[in-house]
Every structure is written in C-alpha cells, then in structure tokens.
Amino acid sequence: LTYHYEGFVNDENASVLDLEPEIFTTANDASPAGEYPITVDGGFAENYHFHYLGAELIVGAGAQHIDLFAVDANATYGDQPLQIEAEATSGLPVEFASSNPDVLEVNGTQLKIRGAGEATIYAYQEGDANFDPANELNATIVVHTAELEVIAHFSSKAYLEPVPELTYHYEGFVNDENASVLD
C-alpha cells in the first residue's frame, strides 16, 4: 500500500514531517474478492494540518485452471461405468458434460455407457466470487460395439426328406438385453 502527499509549500517535502502517516486496510492475504477501504492516519507536522483521503483496495478473482483430467479413451458397450478424474487449481469441484448422452451419460464422476459410438466429455469449472472460470478441457471417447455371436444349431435329415427348420441362438447380449433390441 502506498500514499503520496499534496500541498507542501516553500519547496518543502516529507522530510519536514515530525511523524509520517500510517496506511492500512482491513484486507489480508486470505481476504476474499471484494473491495476493502484503505485508510491513512496519524501524520504530524508543526506547520501543516493533514486532510486524509482514503482509497479502496480491490481484491479481484484469482485465476484457476484444470490441471488434471483423466478418463479412458476407449470402452466397449456393456463395460462398467468409466471413472473421470479432474482437479481445479482452486480446489473447486470440476463438472462434466457429454456431447452425446445416448453414448455416454455423465453421472457425477462416472460415465455410464449407454450405447456404441463416440462422445466428447467436457470438464469445466465455472468459478465463484473468488475464482474466475477455468478454461474448459475435453476428451473424445469411443465406445465400441459389444461382440454378439449367432450360433447355428446342428441339425440332420434323411435323404430326400425336407430340410428341417434351422435354428440358432445368440450369445453375448449385455445389460440384460435380448433379441428384442435387434433392428
């Protein structure tokens, strides 16, 4: 904090002061963003009457960024939810959004796999009274299709007999799905 003088006469300067003024504010290193008064008081000189003009200390919002953002880039339909890790330098919580919730749905710090395809996951921190918003980060994740096997059943017939009805079954459905989901 600084101050200056106005009003010395006869080419005098601060060297004529018997007691220099003190300057202070109510803000400290941990004060949240806002405006704080700066006051000056306590000066004395035999030939001068002091008139103090205060000012304001403006504590602005601090910068922050997301310095950790980790998520698997590949998954397969039917896998367990993916975990997302992210931290902001402010310590504020990082939030997430999906460009394609039909593929990956955000649920807190997990991504629920809803279907095969591609989705971009965005990590963001909007800030608060003490921190500006962080720049958004993103990662594209590919969810591969699950393997579904169609297995033909063995069958037999006698010569010149009609071909019996041929049958098959599926193996590999995930998420309690069955043949009703096939197009």
Which stretches of residues belong to each language-model region?
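Solvent-exposed beta-strand/loop surfaces, strongest in extracytoplasmic domains of secreted
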Residues: 1-183
